[in-house]
Amino acid sequence: FPFSKDIIFEVDSIFKVDLKNFTKIYVFLDEKSMFALKKKFEKYIKNGGVVYSYVYNLPNTTGREIELSNGKKLFIYKQ
């Protein structure tokens, strides 16, 4: 993946933060949390954002699935 020199990492509660100022988000959440955030993530993706989720997928949402060298999966959701 291409990386920019302008990367800023912010750590915050994904349940509280407004995602409109972010172009990409990276999460490692359990199934329950992914389900709870489904609508928020779908809106974010629809508005051009990209969600990278390590191990857990976004329920009933089409995305790209990559198997990593450690055997775990990375799910990528974008428009």
Task: Place the predicted regions along the sequence by residue.
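Weak global preference for isoleucine
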Residues: I7-I8, I14, I25, I45, ...
